[in-house]
Protein backbone atom coordinates (compact mmCIF):
# COMPACT_ATOMS: atom_id res chain seq x y z
CA UNK A 1 0.00 0.00 0.00
CA UNK A 2 1.12 3.57 -0.73
CA UNK A 3 3.30 4.72 2.18
CA UNK A 4 1.47 8.03 2.57
CA UNK A 5 -1.65 6.15 3.65
CA UNK A 6 0.27 3.90 6.03
CA UNK A 7 1.79 7.01 7.62
CA UNK A 8 -1.59 8.65 8.19
CA UNK A 9 -3.49 5.69 9.58
CA UNK A 10 -3.05 2.78 11.94
CA UNK A 11 -2.56 -0.37 9.86
CA UNK A 12 -3.10 -3.68 11.61
CA UNK A 13 -3.08 -7.30 10.46
CA UNK A 14 -4.11 -10.21 12.61
CA UNK A 15 -6.26 -13.27 13.08
CA UNK A 16 -9.62 -13.98 14.67
CA UNK A 17 -11.49 -17.15 15.52
CA UNK A 18 -14.17 -17.93 12.99
CA UNK A 19 -17.48 -19.66 13.69
CA UNK A 20 -15.85 -23.09 13.47
CA UNK A 21 -13.07 -22.17 15.87
CA UNK A 22 -10.49 -21.89 13.10
CA UNK A 23 -8.30 -18.88 12.38
CA UNK A 24 -9.16 -16.28 9.75
CA UNK A 25 -6.90 -13.44 8.68
CA UNK A 26 -7.87 -9.77 8.56
CA UNK A 27 -6.50 -6.27 7.92
CA UNK A 28 -7.70 -2.97 9.35
CA UNK A 29 -6.82 0.60 8.42
CA UNK A 30 -7.85 3.29 10.90
CA UNK A 31 -7.21 6.95 9.99
CA UNK A 32 -7.23 9.77 12.52
CA UNK A 33 -10.79 10.79 13.41
CA UNK A 34 -12.61 8.40 11.03
CA UNK A 35 -16.06 9.52 9.89
CA UNK A 36 -17.47 5.96 9.68
CA UNK A 37 -16.46 2.31 9.40
CA UNK A 38 -16.47 0.32 6.15
CA UNK A 39 -16.33 -3.48 6.20
CA UNK A 40 -15.15 -4.99 2.91
CA UNK A 41 -16.66 -8.39 2.05
CA UNK A 42 -14.51 -9.66 -0.80
CA UNK A 43 -15.36 -11.98 -3.66
CA UNK A 44 -14.51 -15.43 -5.01
CA UNK A 45 -10.79 -16.34 -5.04
CA UNK A 46 -9.82 -12.91 -3.73
CA UNK A 47 -7.56 -11.72 -0.91
CA UNK A 48 -7.08 -8.60 1.17
CA UNK A 49 -4.11 -7.15 -0.70
CA UNK A 50 -6.10 -7.15 -3.94
CA UNK A 51 -8.18 -4.31 -2.46
CA UNK A 52 -5.31 -1.87 -1.85
CA UNK A 53 -6.66 0.61 -4.42
CA UNK A 54 -10.16 0.45 -2.90
CA UNK A 55 -8.79 0.85 0.63
CA UNK A 56 -6.80 3.91 -0.45
CA UNK A 57 -9.92 5.50 -1.93
CA UNK A 58 -11.83 4.89 1.31
CA UNK A 59 -9.01 6.23 3.49
CA UNK A 60 -8.80 9.41 1.41
CA UNK A 61 -12.41 10.11 2.38
CA UNK A 62 -11.78 9.44 6.07
CA UNK A 63 -13.32 5.99 6.46
CA UNK A 64 -11.91 3.33 8.78
CA UNK A 65 -11.59 0.12 6.76
CA UNK A 66 -11.88 -3.48 7.98
CA UNK A 67 -11.11 -6.34 5.60
CA UNK A 68 -11.43 -9.96 6.77
CA UNK A 69 -10.43 -12.76 4.40
CA UNK A 70 -13.11 -15.41 4.02
CA UNK A 71 -12.56 -18.97 5.11
CA UNK A 72 -10.66 -20.81 2.34
CA UNK A 73 -9.12 -17.61 0.94
CA UNK A 74 -5.79 -15.85 1.38
CA UNK A 75 -4.21 -16.59 4.76
CA UNK A 76 -7.44 -17.80 6.37
CA UNK A 77 -8.33 -21.33 7.45
CA UNK A 78 -8.62 -23.87 4.64
CA UNK A 79 -11.14 -26.68 4.56
CA UNK A 80 -9.54 -28.33 1.54
CA UNK A 81 -5.96 -29.60 1.33
CA UNK A 82 -5.49 -28.12 -2.16
CA UNK A 83 -5.10 -24.36 -1.68
CA UNK A 84 -6.03 -23.69 -5.32
CA UNK A 85 -9.59 -24.88 -4.60
CA UNK A 86 -12.49 -23.01 -3.02
CA UNK A 87 -14.60 -25.27 -0.81
CA UNK A 88 -17.36 -24.33 1.61
CA UNK A 89 -20.08 -26.43 3.18
CA UNK A 90 -22.62 -23.62 3.25
CA UNK A 91 -22.62 -19.85 2.76
CA UNK A 92 -23.95 -19.64 6.29
CA UNK A 93 -20.38 -20.46 7.33
CA UNK A 94 -19.14 -17.32 5.55
CA UNK A 95 -21.95 -15.31 7.14
CA UNK A 96 -21.23 -16.52 10.66
CA UNK A 97 -17.50 -15.91 10.21
CA UNK A 98 -18.27 -12.31 9.23
CA UNK A 99 -20.50 -11.95 12.28
CA UNK A 100 -17.70 -13.25 14.53
CA UNK A 101 -15.27 -10.76 13.01
CA UNK A 102 -17.57 -7.77 13.49
CA UNK A 103 -18.41 -8.69 17.06
CA UNK A 104 -14.78 -9.19 18.03
CA UNK A 105 -12.93 -6.52 16.08
CA UNK A 106 -15.22 -3.52 15.46
CA UNK A 107 -16.62 -1.07 18.01
CA UNK A 108 -19.99 -0.58 16.32
CA UNK A 109 -21.30 2.01 18.78
CA UNK A 110 -18.49 4.49 18.14
CA UNK A 111 -19.60 5.43 14.60
CA UNK A 112 -21.80 4.31 11.73
CA UNK A 113 -20.72 1.16 9.93
CA UNK A 114 -21.22 0.51 6.21
CA UNK A 115 -20.85 -2.68 4.19
CA UNK A 116 -18.98 -2.83 0.88
CA UNK A 117 -19.47 -6.23 -0.74
CA UNK A 118 -18.27 -7.48 -4.13
CA UNK A 119 -19.44 -10.48 -6.18
CA UNK A 120 -19.53 -13.59 -3.95
CA UNK A 121 -19.18 -11.16 -1.05
CA UNK A 122 -22.45 -9.63 -2.23
CA UNK A 123 -24.26 -12.93 -1.71
CA UNK A 124 -22.64 -13.27 1.72
CA UNK A 125 -23.49 -9.67 2.54
CA UNK A 126 -27.14 -9.95 1.46
CA UNK A 127 -27.70 -13.05 3.57
CA UNK A 128 -25.95 -11.28 6.45
CA UNK A 129 -28.32 -8.29 6.16
CA UNK A 130 -31.29 -10.66 6.15
CA UNK A 131 -30.07 -12.44 9.30
CA UNK A 132 -28.65 -9.42 11.13
CA UNK A 133 -30.62 -6.40 9.84
CA UNK A 134 -29.46 -3.90 12.48
CA UNK A 135 -25.66 -4.23 12.42
CA UNK A 136 -24.91 -2.16 9.29
CA UNK A 137 -26.29 1.32 8.62
CA UNK A 138 -26.08 1.08 4.81
CA UNK A 139 -24.61 -1.24 2.18
CA UNK A 140 -22.98 -0.99 -1.23
CA UNK A 141 -23.02 -4.09 -3.42
CA UNK A 142 -20.54 -4.06 -6.31
CA UNK A 143 -21.55 -6.52 -9.06
CA UNK A 144 -23.09 -8.80 -6.39
CA UNK A 145 -23.49 -12.51 -7.01
CA UNK A 146 -27.27 -12.75 -6.68
CA UNK A 147 -27.26 -15.19 -9.59
CA UNK A 148 -24.33 -17.31 -10.88
CA UNK A 149 -23.48 -17.55 -14.57
CA UNK A 150 -22.84 -21.22 -15.35
CA UNK A 151 -21.67 -20.83 -18.95
CA UNK A 152 -23.38 -22.93 -21.60
CA UNK A 153 -24.81 -25.24 -18.95
CA UNK A 154 -28.23 -24.01 -17.71
CA UNK A 155 -28.22 -23.39 -13.96
CA UNK A 156 -30.84 -26.09 -13.15
CA UNK A 157 -28.60 -28.67 -14.82
CA UNK A 158 -25.47 -27.28 -13.16
CA UNK A 159 -27.33 -27.46 -9.84
CA UNK A 160 -28.25 -31.11 -10.45
CA UNK A 161 -24.70 -32.04 -11.51
CA UNK A 162 -23.20 -30.33 -8.44
CA UNK A 163 -25.67 -32.04 -6.13
CA UNK A 164 -24.98 -35.46 -7.66
CA UNK A 165 -21.21 -34.91 -7.49
CA UNK A 166 -21.47 -34.09 -3.78
CA UNK A 167 -23.68 -37.12 -3.14
CA UNK A 168 -21.07 -39.47 -4.63
CA UNK A 169 -18.21 -37.95 -2.62
CA UNK A 170 -16.83 -35.58 -5.27
CA UNK A 171 -17.64 -32.35 -3.43
CA UNK A 172 -13.95 -31.38 -3.26
CA UNK A 173 -13.38 -31.97 -6.99
CA UNK A 174 -13.20 -29.00 -9.33
CA UNK A 175 -16.57 -28.10 -10.83
CA UNK A 176 -16.75 -28.42 -14.61
CA UNK A 177 -14.74 -25.64 -16.25
CA UNK A 178 -12.80 -24.83 -13.06
CA UNK A 179 -9.08 -25.44 -12.56
CA UNK A 180 -6.09 -24.51 -10.46
CA UNK A 181 -3.77 -21.54 -10.89
CA UNK A 182 -1.51 -22.10 -13.91
CA UNK A 183 0.62 -18.96 -13.74
CA UNK A 184 -0.49 -17.79 -17.20
CA UNK A 185 -1.64 -14.23 -17.82
CA UNK A 186 -5.10 -13.82 -19.38
CA UNK A 187 -6.12 -10.17 -19.24
CA UNK A 188 -8.57 -10.52 -22.13
CA UNK A 189 -10.78 -12.97 -20.23
CA UNK A 190 -10.28 -11.38 -16.82
CA UNK A 191 -12.78 -9.36 -14.79
CA UNK A 192 -10.63 -6.20 -15.04
CA UNK A 193 -11.05 -3.45 -17.61
CA UNK A 194 -7.82 -1.76 -16.47
CA UNK A 195 -4.77 -3.71 -17.61
CA UNK A 196 -2.61 -1.89 -15.05
CA UNK A 197 -4.80 -3.17 -12.22
CA UNK A 198 -4.81 -6.66 -13.71
CA UNK A 199 -1.01 -6.77 -13.87
CA UNK A 200 -0.69 -5.62 -10.25
CA UNK A 201 -3.06 -8.34 -9.03
CA UNK A 202 -1.53 -11.05 -11.23
CA UNK A 203 1.93 -10.26 -9.85
CA UNK A 204 0.64 -10.56 -6.27
CA UNK A 205 -1.06 -13.87 -7.03
CA UNK A 206 1.91 -15.27 -8.90
CA UNK A 207 4.31 -14.50 -6.04
CA UNK A 208 2.24 -15.79 -3.11
CA UNK A 209 0.89 -19.33 -2.76
CA UNK A 210 -1.82 -18.12 -0.35
CA UNK A 211 -3.20 -15.91 -3.15
CA UNK A 212 -3.41 -18.69 -5.75
CA UNK A 213 -6.91 -19.84 -4.78
CA UNK A 214 -8.40 -20.10 -8.25
CA UNK A 215 -11.18 -22.61 -8.88
CA UNK A 216 -14.49 -23.58 -7.34
CA UNK A 217 -15.37 -27.10 -6.24
CA UNK A 218 -18.71 -28.81 -6.74
CA UNK A 219 -19.54 -28.21 -3.07
CA UNK A 220 -18.78 -24.50 -3.45
CA UNK A 221 -20.97 -24.33 -6.57
CA UNK A 222 -23.83 -26.13 -4.84
CA UNK A 223 -23.55 -23.87 -1.79
CA UNK A 224 -23.47 -20.79 -4.04
CA UNK A 225 -26.59 -21.75 -5.99
CA UNK A 226 -28.47 -22.50 -2.78
CA UNK A 227 -27.29 -19.19 -1.29
CA UNK A 228 -28.61 -17.14 -4.22
CA UNK A 229 -31.95 -18.92 -4.02
CA UNK A 230 -32.09 -18.21 -0.28
CA UNK A 231 -31.24 -14.52 -0.48
CA UNK A 232 -33.80 -13.83 -3.24
CA UNK A 233 -36.75 -15.34 -1.37
CA UNK A 234 -39.31 -12.59 -0.86
CA UNK A 235 -39.70 -13.34 2.86
CA UNK A 236 -35.94 -12.95 3.32
CA UNK A 237 -35.50 -9.79 1.25
CA UNK A 238 -38.23 -8.08 3.28
CA UNK A 239 -36.00 -8.40 6.36
CA UNK A 240 -33.47 -5.90 4.97
CA UNK A 241 -34.12 -2.54 6.65
CA UNK A 242 -31.24 -0.35 5.51
CA UNK A 243 -30.48 1.69 2.36
CA UNK A 244 -28.66 -0.35 -0.29
CA UNK A 245 -26.88 0.77 -3.47
CA UNK A 246 -26.12 -1.82 -6.16
CA UNK A 247 -23.48 -1.18 -8.81
CA UNK A 248 -23.97 -3.28 -11.93
CA UNK A 249 -21.33 -3.83 -14.64
CA UNK A 250 -22.41 -3.73 -18.28
CA UNK A 251 -20.00 -6.45 -19.42
CA UNK A 252 -20.38 -8.84 -16.50
CA UNK A 253 -19.59 -12.44 -17.45
CA UNK A 254 -19.54 -13.73 -13.86
CA UNK A 255 -22.94 -12.91 -12.35
CA UNK A 256 -26.50 -12.52 -13.62
CA UNK A 257 -27.50 -8.87 -13.84
CA UNK A 258 -31.20 -9.73 -14.03
CA UNK A 259 -31.02 -11.09 -10.48
CA UNK A 260 -30.22 -7.56 -9.27
CA UNK A 261 -33.66 -6.45 -10.41
CA UNK A 262 -35.30 -9.23 -8.40
CA UNK A 263 -33.51 -7.88 -5.34
CA UNK A 264 -34.59 -4.34 -6.24
CA UNK A 265 -38.22 -5.44 -6.41
CA UNK A 266 -38.02 -7.38 -3.15
CA UNK A 267 -36.44 -4.67 -0.99
CA UNK A 268 -37.65 -1.21 -0.05
CA UNK A 269 -34.58 1.03 0.13
CA UNK A 270 -32.49 -0.22 -2.77
CA UNK A 271 -31.19 1.72 -5.77
CA UNK A 272 -29.23 0.43 -8.74
CA UNK A 273 -26.57 2.10 -10.85
CA UNK A 274 -25.31 0.50 -14.04
CA UNK A 275 -21.76 1.35 -15.13
CA UNK A 276 -21.44 1.15 -18.89
CA UNK A 277 -18.12 -0.03 -20.30
CA UNK A 278 -17.12 -1.95 -17.18
CA UNK A 279 -16.43 -5.62 -16.63
CA UNK A 280 -17.19 -7.49 -13.40
CA UNK A 281 -14.63 -5.73 -11.18
CA UNK A 282 -15.89 -2.16 -11.45
CA UNK A 283 -13.21 -0.91 -9.04
CA UNK A 284 -10.69 -2.12 -11.65
CA UNK A 285 -12.45 -0.47 -14.60
CA UNK A 286 -11.20 2.49 -16.62
CA UNK A 287 -10.55 5.85 -15.00
CA UNK A 288 -13.80 7.42 -16.22
CA UNK A 289 -15.88 4.52 -14.91
CA UNK A 290 -14.11 4.51 -11.56
CA UNK A 291 -14.65 8.25 -11.21
CA UNK A 292 -18.42 7.78 -11.50
CA UNK A 293 -18.30 4.69 -9.29
CA UNK A 294 -16.59 6.34 -6.33
CA UNK A 295 -18.43 9.63 -6.76
CA UNK A 296 -21.80 7.90 -6.50
CA UNK A 297 -20.68 5.58 -3.70
CA UNK A 298 -19.37 8.36 -1.47
CA UNK A 299 -22.40 10.50 -2.20
CA UNK A 300 -24.60 7.61 -1.06
CA UNK A 301 -22.67 7.09 2.18
CA UNK A 302 -22.50 10.82 2.89
CA UNK A 303 -26.27 10.95 2.62
CA UNK A 304 -26.53 8.26 5.28
CA UNK A 305 -24.17 10.23 7.53
CA UNK A 306 -26.27 13.38 7.13
CA UNK A 307 -29.63 11.76 7.76
CA UNK A 308 -30.85 9.25 10.30
CA UNK A 309 -33.10 7.69 7.69
CA UNK A 310 -32.42 8.20 4.01
CA UNK A 311 -35.07 6.87 1.65
CA UNK A 312 -34.67 7.52 -2.06
CA UNK A 313 -37.95 8.11 -3.85
CA UNK A 314 -36.82 10.26 -6.76
CA UNK A 315 -37.16 9.38 -10.40
CA UNK A 316 -37.67 5.74 -11.10
CA UNK A 317 -35.46 5.66 -14.16
CA UNK A 318 -32.88 8.29 -14.96
CA UNK A 319 -29.86 8.57 -17.21
CA UNK A 320 -26.52 10.20 -16.53
CA UNK A 321 -23.55 10.92 -18.77
CA UNK A 322 -19.98 11.38 -17.63
CA UNK A 323 -17.15 12.76 -19.81
CA UNK A 324 -19.00 11.61 -22.95
CA UNK A 325 -17.54 8.16 -22.34
CA UNK A 326 -19.48 6.65 -19.50
CA UNK A 327 -23.24 6.30 -19.42
CA UNK A 328 -24.79 5.13 -16.19
CA UNK A 329 -28.35 4.04 -15.75
CA UNK A 330 -29.81 4.60 -12.31
CA UNK A 331 -32.82 2.60 -11.21
CA UNK A 332 -34.10 4.01 -7.92
CA UNK A 333 -36.06 2.44 -5.14
CA UNK A 334 -39.38 1.13 -6.32
CA UNK A 335 -42.71 1.64 -4.61
CA UNK A 336 -45.76 -0.57 -4.85
CA UNK A 337 -47.23 1.31 -7.83
CA UNK A 338 -44.09 0.84 -9.92
CA UNK A 339 -43.43 -2.87 -9.69
CA UNK A 340 -44.63 -3.40 -13.26
CA UNK A 341 -42.30 -0.67 -14.50
CA UNK A 342 -39.42 -2.38 -12.73
CA UNK A 343 -40.22 -5.64 -14.46
CA UNK A 344 -40.18 -3.87 -17.81
CA UNK A 345 -36.66 -2.68 -17.04
CA UNK A 346 -35.60 -6.34 -16.94
CA UNK A 347 -35.80 -6.31 -20.72
CA UNK A 348 -33.35 -3.40 -20.84
CA UNK A 349 -30.67 -4.75 -18.50
Where do the PLM segments sit?
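N-terminal cap/lid segment of alpha/beta-hydrolase-fold proteins
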Residues: 1-30
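Active-site glycine-rich loops that stabilize anionic/oxyanionic intermediates
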Residues: 43-46
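Conserved alpha/beta-hydrolase
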Residues: 57-81
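Alpha/beta-hydrolase active-site loop
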Residues: 86-104
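Alpha/beta-hydrolase-fold enzymes
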Residues: 125-211
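Short beta-strand/loop motif that positions the catalytic acidic residue
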Residues: 240, 246-248
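Short alpha-helix in the alpha/beta-hydrolase fold that links the catalytic acid
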Residues: 242, 256-264
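Catalytic active-site module of serine/aspartate enzymes centered on a nucleophile-bearing elbow/loop
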Residues: 276-335, 346-349
